[in-house]
């Protein structure tokens, strides 16, 4: 779950971790191989009745644009050719196919994506957005996943990490994510309130750099969105593992302008992906099998 970044550089990263992260990043994000093993592109044929719902101007243009801010694997990141890939890109591409459109991901600073959607220079935002009440004042969201925070630890750690007893630990996070703002920092404050040693928080610009800190032993744990922690563990060559259950669950969604004519068409396309099983297949290719939806939701509400 992502919120606009604070416009300053990471202060926790040292020269050593930055240098080493280049050699370990491919283990964590799979950048060299790009898509997961066995991945195949799923682009359904257009569905005429859904295609007819697409606003005329977009139908004539023929290309659906989506703003993304990599890296945030497995949601969006760049492969070795510099192409933006990830589960959100696959989902939006499939939705576009159902609507008879091509798909064009557009890299943009995270803080500028929603304003660009609102201004009409992007059709949608697809960059790990949490669907919450504050954002719904200006945007509608087609939800695609319910996910929460989950911690990870080194697999060779003798004493398992317990997030409920984390005082005195060093925890790596991606800056301004819910894992930092709503989980680790409040936990640390509670430690201090109880007279215990606070949590040392290492905040990084990207999730893969935070995971690298855990791999290098600079952190005792990683706290991140559950799919992010699971992806990092899967790509770590057995060096880290998720621990405990996820919590603070919330919906992830694609952002649309408020009351946009495109939203009903895109929601119908997403429902088609669910009905045909393409949604489940796309998610499974990225190792996401929990928190899936049974029906399309706009702002957590069913279409009918």
Swiss-Prot record:
SUPFAM superfamilies: Periplasmic binding protein-like II
Coiled-coil residues: none
Subcellular location: Cell membrane
GO biological process, one term: amino acid transport
Lipid linkage positions (S-diacylglycerol cysteine): 27
Observed phenotype of the null mutant: Deletion of argTUV in an L-arginine producer strain results in a faster and 24% higher L-arginine production in comparison to the parental strain.
Cross-referenced SMART domains: PBPb
Signal peptide location: 1-26
Membrane topology type: Lipid-anchor
Annotated keywords: Amino-acid transport, Cell membrane, Lipoprotein, Membrane, Palmitate, Signal, Transport
N-palmitoyl cysteine lipid modification positions: 27
Parts of the chain that traverse the membrane: none
GO CC annotation terms, alphabetical: plasma membrane
UniProt record similarity statement: Belongs to the bacterial solute-binding protein 3 family.
Quaternary structure, from the entry: The complex is probably composed of two ATP-binding proteins (ArgV), two transmembrane proteins (ArgU) and a solute-binding protein (ArgT).
Function noted in UniProt: Part of the ABC transporter complex ArgTUV involved in L-arginine import. May also transport L-citrulline. Binds L-arginine and its molecular precursor L-citrulline, but not L-histidine, L-glutamate, L-glutamine, L-lysine or L-cysteine.
Protein's name according to its UniProt entry: Arginine-binding protein ArgT
Lineage, broadest ranks: Bacteria, Bacillati, Actinomycetota, Actinomycetes, Mycobacteriales
